[in-house]
């Protein structure tokens, strides 16, 4: 599923991400824009670590989910990576909450550091009624 910007903002708010661990809703929408272009089915393989990033938040199989093929995988979210590709993003959001609970917080995501950090992210929720 490819979310429309405001549809995603409303969904993330309903799933409790607004202000979670101090991260604003606009920052989460910015993250999703630059990681997956709002696409729940997005996958990207990382040859160096032989790991894959999954879903709207591009959550990595080395640490967070199990895809059955990543060496030394940790599976800290206790989830199948395929669950992160569903149209229903409830499980992806739950895992993102686990990721952002680590000391690195939202900085765990390279795309957030590159495109959202220290920027005006208000545009990502503008006119969304959230």
From Swiss-Prot:
Native organism: Canis lupus familiaris
Q: Active-site residues?
A: 35, 53
Domain of life, source organism:
Eukaryota
> What enzyme class is recorded for this protein?
hydrolase
**Similarity comment: family membership:** Belongs to the glycosyl hydrolase 22 family.
Q: Which GO terms describe its molecular function?
A: lysozyme activity
**InterPro entries given in the database record:** Glyco_hydro_22 (IPR001916), Glyco_hydro_22_CS (IPR019799), Glyco_hydro_22_lys (IPR000974), Lysozyme-like_dom_sf (IPR023346)
**Record keywords: Disulfide bond included?**
yes
Kindly list the cysteine pairs connected by disulfide bridges. 6-128, 30-116, 65-81, 77-95
> What's its job?
Lysozymes have primarily a bacteriolytic function; those in tissues and body fluids are associated with the monocyte-macrophage system and enhance the activity of immunoagents.
Q: How does it assemble?
A: Monomer.
- Reproduce the miscellaneous comment text: Lysozyme C is capable of both hydrolysis and transglycosylation; it also shows a slight esterase activity. It acts rapidly on both peptide-substituted and unsubstituted peptidoglycan, and slowly on chitin oligosaccharides.
| Residues passing through the membrane, by range | none
Q: Where is the C-type lysozyme domain?
A: 1-130
Q: Name one GO biological process term.
A: defense response to Gram-positive bacterium
Q: What is its EC number?
A: 3.2.1.17
- Can you state which reaction this protein catalyses? Hydrolysis of (1->4)-beta-linkages between N-acetylmuramic acid and N-acetyl-D-glucosamine residues in a peptidoglycan and between N-acetyl-D-glucosamine residues in chitodextrins
The upper taxonomy is:
Eukaryota, Metazoa, Chordata, Craniata, Vertebrata
| Keyword entries, A-Z | Antimicrobial, Bacteriolytic enzyme, Disulfide bond, Glycosidase, Hydrolase
Q: Which CDD domains match?
A: LYZ_C
Q: Identify this protein by name.
A: Lysozyme C, spleen isozyme
